[in-house]
Each structure stands twice: as structure tokens, then as C-alpha cells.
């Protein structure tokens, strides 16, 4: 009981501490995704029609209840929304921070805002009193009602007549169920990670995944290994499950040409650095080749030690960069890497970065992940640090234009628009959308 009250008190105090003390102390303290959002035009819901296009005839609106902030690292949910919008669907994307992104504390702020992101894509912001960390715990009844009411008000303001819910994290299960009860909105669970492999996911959120599996009209898995793992536990999923892998926005990377400046061999990585990153593989390669340069581009998580590359001056931690800047960084790479430890979390992943590397034609050295091994003729697989070094040496020496062309062909074929088309077709079979 006392522990629960302490948690309640901490949640009530945290928004004031963050916005009045922690964020103002340093510009670096405020998450970059919050700053990026504030650069877009936002309006109260009653003015929604000023920034949202009219619904397309015959096409349902797509409600994305995601695992990721739109303004953070570009991941599956953002790309699927872009795919849907490219097919004519309006997309509404819920910001998962539930008020923490607002510059003002709850009593002083707007409670609902709609942000215009791109043509046919808008982002809903709902401010909750406690601003709960969305992957730490289940939403309570009042919070579910507030989020649901915000979505319903948005749909009314934008004259939405048909919708489908694409749920990327089980914390939104109760919201999706309320929407289905009120509007007969089909529920898609887009399961793209083995959630139990993350340290920061609350146990009651993990418990909710079973409820979401049971209630979803369609379950989409992003990887074959992930699908097999869950269906082996819940055989009843087999009748409503489909594998739809990740993809690439190949046009975004189409102009990438290796910078020919005569500099050192450059080995690159794009993505988060956390507990699943194989530090020893990169250390071994950097130690063996001190004349090479290693560029690791992406945010570091709490599971990544600060001294991971102590003593290795040829390794640069670049930090998070905007999606628009990724092509310029990849143009510096001679070889791209996916150095992941082999564990259930990584075996369940279908790395977006693989398709993005392919879109640039880059040779890729990777741990033997199940989804990467499907392209064994186009990648260099390495099962331990010593082999990782050897495969990097092979990849650096690659001089086969046909392989670069083949990789680009894969990226063009495995695009986000086609993934969205497949999802719509699969949902139509089950829910009549």
C-alpha cells in the first residue's frame, strides 16, 4: 500500500519537476522529439478542420496507437502511417507521451491538441494529469476514458465516418476496445518486437499483451521468428495472424553515393545503442584496424555502458540525428553493420536498418539474425567478434557492382507502401475493411 502511494506521489510531482527544474537547467535535458513537435502547427480540436484534409471516399481513417513518438527515431509505425497516407487514407497518430511533451504543466496547458505533420497525417496530443510513462504501467480507468474521449472528439471534429485501429503497444488495449465498442473500429495488433526482451516495459503492460492478442481482429508480426514464438504459446492466433516485415523508403536513400575523399575506411552503424548491441564485436574490429573509422549514429540507451569504447579513439558516438540526415551519414560509410547479441529480442527483430542499408547498396556485416540470414547472399554474417573482424575485412574489399544493385533492388521491392497495401488486404479478409 505504501509503495503504491509513493508511486502515485512520484507521478504527481514528476511533471512539475521536469518542466520547472530539469528541462530548463539544460537545453540537452529536454528530449529532442519534444522540440521537434513544437516546430509543427498545432490547433485545439475545435479548429481541426483548418489543418486536416477531408476523408477520402470509401477509405477508412487509420488510427495509430503506437510504441514510438513520431518525432523520435523513424520506425515502423511512422513508416506505415506514411504508407497508408500515400494510399489515400487519413492517418491519426497518437503521441504516446500523454502530456509530457507539452511545455506547460497540466493545470496551465491545453488538454487536447491536433498537429499537422504531413498531408493526410495528423498527430493527437492528449494531456493526462500524471503524464504516465507509457511503457511503464497500464493506464487506469480514468486515463483510458480521457484518451478515448480525446480520440472520439478528434474523429467528430474531422468528420471521420470509418476507422481502423493499429495498435503498436499493449498499453493502448483498453482504448482500442472502447473505440471498437463505440464505433465498431477493427483492431490490428502490429506486434513488431518481443516486448519481454526490453528492460523498461512494465509487467502489467506485458500482461496486457495477452488481452490484446485475444481481442485483436488481426495480429501482424514483423518477423517469422516472432510469429512462431507467439503462436507456439497461443495456437489460437494462427487463424488471424500474418507476417508483414519491415521495409525501406528507398527514395529517401536513392541518391546516396559514397563520398570519395580518400579518407580512412569507414564502418558505420545506424540505430539505437543499448543492451543488445555487441560491444565486443566493434571493439575487436576497432582494435584490429586502428586506421579505420567507426561511426555509430544513434541514441544511447540506459543499457549501454558509457565507457563501452574506452581507449579506442577511432570509434565515434555521433548520437541521434534526424531522419532527413541519415542519407548524408550513410554516404560516409564503406560498410554498414548490425552488431547485435544473439538473444530472443534480437532474433525476433526484422531490422529496418537492413533495408535502409540495402537502399544505399552498402555491404552489410551482421550478427546471424534470423531475418538478416534470409539475405545471406547479400550480407556478411558473423557469429563472434573474431569472425566479425574477418567479415568486415571481406566487405571492405567487395568490388561487385551487381551486389550493390541487387541490394537496391531488394529495398525498392520491400517498400513501406507495399507493406501498407498488404496490411489493408489482410484486414479486408477478416474485418471487411
Language model features: what each stretch is:
Residues 304-330:
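Nucleotide-activated donor-binding/catalytic signature segment of Leloir-type glycosyltransferases, i.e.
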Residues 80, 152-154, 202-219:
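Membrane-proximal helix-turn-helix segments that form the acceptor-binding/catalytic region
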Residues 260-277, 282-286, 294-297, 412:
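Conserved donor-binding/catalytic core segment of Leloir-type glycosyltransferases
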Residues 225, 244-247:
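Carbohydrate-associated surface elements
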Residues 400-430:
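A charged, aromatic-enriched C-terminal amphipathic alpha-helix characteristic of glycosyltransferases
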Residues 71, 75, 277, 324-329, ...:
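Nucleotide-sugar-dependent
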Amino acid at each position: 500500500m505504501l509503495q503504491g502511494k509513493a508511486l502515485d506521489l512520484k507521478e504527481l510531482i514528476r511533471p512539475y519537476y521536469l518542466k520547472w527544474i530539469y528541462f530548463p537547467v539544460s537545453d540537452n535535458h529536454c528530449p529532442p522529439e519534444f522540440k521537434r513537435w513544437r516546430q509543427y502547427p498545432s490547433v485545439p480540436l475545435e479548429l481541426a478542420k483548418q489543418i486536416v484534409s477531408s476523408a477520402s471516399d470509401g477509405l477508412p481513417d487509420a488510427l495509430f496507437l503506437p510504441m514510438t513518438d513520431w518525432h523520435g527515431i523513424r520506425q515502423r509505425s511512422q513508416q506505415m502511417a506514411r504508407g497508408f497516407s500515400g494510399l489515400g487514407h487519413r492517418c491519426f497518430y497518437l503521441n504516446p507521451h500523454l502530456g509530457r511533451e507539452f511545455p506547460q504543466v497540466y493545470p496551465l496547458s491545453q488538454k487536447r491538441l491536433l498537429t499537422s505533420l504531413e498531408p493526410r497525417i495528423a498527430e493527437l496530443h492528449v494531456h493526462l494529469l500524471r503524464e504516465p510513462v507509457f511503457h511503464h504501467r497500464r493506464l487506469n480507468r480514468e486515463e483510458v476514458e480521457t484518451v478515448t474521449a480525446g480520440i472520439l472528439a478528434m474523429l467528430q471534429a474531422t468528420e471521420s465516418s470509418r476507422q481502423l485501429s493499429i495498435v503498436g503497444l499493449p498499453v493502448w488495449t483498453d482504448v482500442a476496445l472502447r473505440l471498437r465498442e463505440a464505433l465498431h473500429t477493427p483492431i490490428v495488433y502490429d506486434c513488431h518486437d518481443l516486448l519481454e526482451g526490453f528492460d523498461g516495459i512494465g509487467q502489467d503492460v506485458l500482461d496486457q499483451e495477452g488481452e490484446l492478442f485475444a481481442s485483436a481482429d488481426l495480429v501482424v508480426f514483423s518477423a517469422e521468428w516472432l510469429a512462431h514464438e507467439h503462436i507456439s504459446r497461443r495456437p489460437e492466433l494462427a487463424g488471424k495472424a500474418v507476417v508483414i516485415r519491415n521495409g525501406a523508403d528507398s527514395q529517401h536513400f536513392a541518391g546516396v553515393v559514397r563520398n570519395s575523399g580518400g579518407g580512412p575506411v569507414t564502418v558505420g552503424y545506424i540505430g539505437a545503442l543499448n543492451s543488445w548491441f555487441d560491444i565486443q564485436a566493434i571493439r575487436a574490429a576497432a582494435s584490429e584496424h586502428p586506421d579505420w573509422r567507426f561511426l555509430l549514429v544513434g541514441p544511447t540507451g540506459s543499457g549501454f555502458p558509457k565507457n563501452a569504447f574506452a581507449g579506442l579513439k577511432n570509434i565515434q558516438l555521433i548520437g541521434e540525428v534526424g531522419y532527413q540526415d541519415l542519407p548524408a551519414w550513410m554516404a560516409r560509410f564503406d560498410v554498414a553493420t548490425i552488431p547485435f547479441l544473439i538473444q530472443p529480442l534480437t532474433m525476433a527483430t526484422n531490422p529496418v536498418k537492413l533495408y535502409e542499408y540495402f537502399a544505399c547498396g552498402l555491404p552489410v556485416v551482421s550478427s546471424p539474425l534470423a531475418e538478416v540470414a534470409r539475405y545471406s547472399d547479400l550480407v556478411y554474417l558473423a557469429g563472434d567478434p573474431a569472425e566479425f573482424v574477418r567479415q568486415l575485412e571481406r566487405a571492405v574489399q567487395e568490388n561487385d557492382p551487381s551486389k550493390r544493385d541487387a541490394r537496391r533492388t531488394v529495398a525498392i521491392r520491400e517498400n513501406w507502401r507495399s507493406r501498407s497495401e498488404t496490411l489493408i488486404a489482410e484486414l479486408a479478409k477478416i474485418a471487411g475493411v
